[in-house]
């Protein structure tokens, strides 16, 4: 008699991981859940949704009929994710902690814990992505439900890690996930999807970040070098942002809103310009560092592919030119708006995610 394959699923207390767990058990795997605690509520004014999510996870595992384990990765999260998050904000970048969390916590610490400590054959998550064997390696592909596709957030893992992963809902629509959860009467069937940064929860970002970084107010200048306001601290703004600038109407040259187009870290200046498609927002190329190729084969020659420089963005055609093993230049066939250093550029060939890296710098339309 063949022994059942053991799968440890990351149970978050949400509908996606709940239905994923049900699919796995229905498919005949020996399934156990792990609820990861990645954040310690040191400051009582900062409430994460940990307790509510844990309770929902425990109830849903009981409904499905699987055991649940609680594993604390908060120390690893602090050192490998949150410290980097703070460091990047401090120097004016716009980091993405969810990508770091997937890279360092879910698909490294959790994966190793499940395989070594729990003798699992695989781990599973409720991510909307697909894993397909391609050229003899496990590769990452966009989800069937493109509106929910999360391959952008998983591009930092590699084919070896992918080979140990199962994504049960990558081939179905989100609406069907909700439908299945409702038919099973799972407690999470009507639970809202989590949004924003996990350790902030429903709290205001500005209030949260003040607990860790000091405000450093400064001046706002237009691209014409005219002082037109003050800012609360560069860490509160990102390239392409239009809300929260509070620029007085007397400084408007037209009806177009003001947008953040640059940060002068050395002088603590915030630079703004009017119009969504103004040349100070439009980039023709970018430099990427810490590039990860999922198949772990480094580029030797330029390739033409599609790229996203932020999650909710249509991919655009580009030419990728290798500089060294971890650095590349990306030339856009058409200029794109609001590229933010510190964010990630992620590359695709059709629906296959090739990998990506951190945006170090950009070349604007106006640059010679």
UniProtKB/Swiss-Prot annotation:
InterPro entries hit by this protein: MnmA-like (IPR004506), MnmA-like_C (IPR046885), MnmA-like_central (IPR046884), MnmA-like_central_sf (IPR023382), Rossmann-like_a/b/a_fold (IPR014729)
Pfam families per the UniProt record, alphabetical: tRNA_Me_trans, tRNA_Me_trans_C, tRNA_Me_trans_M
A Gene Ontology biological process term: tRNA wobble position uridine thiolation
Sequence segments annotated as region (Interaction with tRNA): 148-150, 310-311
Catalytic activity entry: S-sulfanyl-L-cysteinyl-[protein] + uridine(34) in tRNA + AH2 + ATP = 2-thiouridine(34) in tRNA + L-cysteinyl-[protein] + A + AMP + diphosphate + H(+)
Residues reported to bind ATP: 10-17, 36, 126
CDD domains registered for this protein in UniProt: MnmA_TRMU-like
Intrachain disulfide bonds: 101-198
Active site: 101 (nucleophile), 198 (cysteine persulfide intermediate)
Region (Interaction with target base in tRNA): 96-98
Keywords: ATP-binding, Cytoplasm, Disulfide bond, Nucleotide-binding, RNA-binding, Transferase, tRNA processing, tRNA-binding
Family in the record: Belongs to the MnmA/TRMU family.
Function: Catalyzes the 2-thiolation of uridine at the wobble position (U34) of tRNA(Lys), tRNA(Glu) and tRNA(Gln), leading to the formation of s(2)U34, the first step of tRNA-mnm(5)s(2)U34 synthesis. Sulfur is provided by IscS, via a sulfur-relay system. Binds ATP and its substrate tRNAs.
Protein name: tRNA-specific 2-thiouridylase MnmA
Organism placement in taxonomy: Bacteria, Pseudomonadati, Pseudomonadota, Gammaproteobacteria, Enterobacterales
Gene: mnmA
């Amino acid at each position: 008699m063949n022994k059942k394959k053991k799968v440890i699923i990351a149970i978050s207390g949400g509908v996606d991981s709940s239905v994923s767990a049900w699919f796995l058990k229905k498919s005949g795997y020996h399934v156990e859940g792990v609820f990861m605690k990645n954040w310690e509520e040191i400051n009582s004014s900062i409430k994460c949704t940990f307790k509510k999510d844990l309770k929902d996870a425990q109830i849903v595992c009981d409904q499905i009929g699987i055991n649940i384990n609680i594993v604390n990765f908060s120390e690893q999260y602090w050192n490998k994710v949150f410290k980097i998050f703070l460091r990047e904000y401090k120097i004016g970048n716009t980091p993405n902690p969810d990508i770091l969390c997937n890279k360092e916590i879910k698909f490294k610490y959790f994966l190793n814990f499940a395989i070594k400590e729990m003798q699992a054959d695989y781990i599973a998550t409720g991510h909307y992505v697909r894993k397909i064997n391609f050229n003899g390696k496990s590769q990452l592909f966009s989800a069937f439900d493109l509106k929910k596709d999360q391959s952008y957030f998983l591009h930092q893992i590699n084919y070896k890690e992918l080979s140990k992963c199962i994504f049960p809902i990558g081939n179905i629509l989100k609406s069907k996930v909700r439908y299945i959860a409702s038919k099973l009467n799972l407690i999470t069937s009507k639970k809202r999807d989590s949004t924003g940064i996990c350790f902030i929860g429903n709290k205001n970002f500005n209030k949260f970040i003040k607990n860790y970084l000091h405000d450093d107010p400064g001046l706002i200048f237009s691209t014409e070098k005219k002082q037109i306001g003050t800012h609360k601290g560069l860490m509160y703004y990102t390239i392409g942002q239009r809300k929260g600038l509070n620029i007085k109407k007397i400084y408007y040259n037209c009806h177009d809103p003001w947008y953040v187009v640059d940060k002068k870290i050395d002088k603590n200046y915030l630079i703004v310009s009017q119009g969504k498609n103004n040349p100070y927002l439009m980039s023709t190329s970018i430099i990427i560092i810490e590039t990860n190729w999922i198949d772990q084969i480094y580029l030797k020659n330029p390739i033409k592919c599609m790229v996203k420089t932020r999650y909710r963005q249509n991919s655009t055609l580009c030419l990728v030119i290798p500089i060294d093993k971890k650095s590349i230049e990306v030339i856009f066939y058409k200029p794109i708006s609001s590229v933010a250093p510190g964010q990630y550029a992620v590359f695709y060939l059709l629906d296959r995610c090739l990998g990506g890296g951190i945006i170090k710098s950009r070349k604007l339309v106006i640059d010679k």
